[in-house]
């Protein structure tokens, strides 16, 4: 733990700054550390050495929560991930998980949503709204009036082979999401959404803050399978307190989703958090420029086996047993300014010698 903390000393200063307030109100300085602090890591791919590094920083800072946005396994659900669940139970910080595309199969077997929920979601602590047991849930943080919603991007369990299981939000989850957001509207909760993939991809080189790499290499450069923006459309209605009525037909499966909802007042959406693309892609959705998406590169840096998962599709060099073997983010949430401070722990210098250490992004503001 000590080595990880010492070699990231600059990042740790920025994390401290990200959670600090220094505001004068009625002649007094406001509470100095009242911001929500979040750790976001993704695509661990069974790299337990680097996972221990993530845990070291989580335990050192005690953020409000941490979330891993999918692909715990090295290749598929034949891989043993019990170590992850054993270790997060030992942490005082609540750590959550999303289902990734690599979890959805075991060799040639396509796994049901119920099976995925039992293996990757049910072991988590203090989750709510998971009555259906199909990979999605939420967690409330009353002290901040924030709800974290975790989605299952891969509901299409009826595919004949696993490589046809693309991003699809089906009717039941869409209805559940609307009902969950209506509770937030009623109770005045702001919303964050975590999932393996973003509802719409942030294009490469689309961010001036430095946290969006220039290219999206194969196979992540193929046309996005998520041709519909069901979640983003619903969030837009939630943000602006308006109605949404639409029918969506997924081209791969032919499945139809009917959305007919109305929100009565404007509500606060903070951001999406996702991974999957093994690169940094922070920016705003092209369809909704006021919806911020925080896409993080993979936390794993596994040089053994078929490739170095951290290095091959990212503009960041990832060298085992150095500071660059790690790559994960901390976020400080400023609800008053509607601003998120992003701080990188680990690899933060790209191939152009540009530093990717910190940046600030507004959210929920019309552009």
Where in the sequence are the language-model features?
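Active-site glycine-centered loops adjacent to acidic/histidine catalytic or metal-binding residues
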Residues: 43, 70-71, 100-101, 151, ...
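A short C-terminal boundary segment appended to hydrolase-like catalytic domains
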Residues: 2-22, 32, 286, 306-367
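Residue-level marker for buried hydrophobic side chains located in beta-strands
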Residues: 38-40, 66-68, 97-98, 193, ...
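N-terminal active-site segment of His-dependent metallophosphoesterases
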Residues: 2-83
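His/acidic metal-ligating clusters that form di-metal
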Residues: 28, 59-65, 147-149, 161-287
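Short boundary motifs at domain starts and secondary-structure transition points
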Residues: 25-33, 139-142, 261-263
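Short, solvent-exposed loop/turn segments at secondary-structure junctions
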Residues: 45-46, 103-104, 153-156, 197-201, ...
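Extended active-site neighborhood of metal-dependent phosphoesterases/phosphodiesterases
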Residues: 78-182, 217-222, 230-233, 237-240, ...
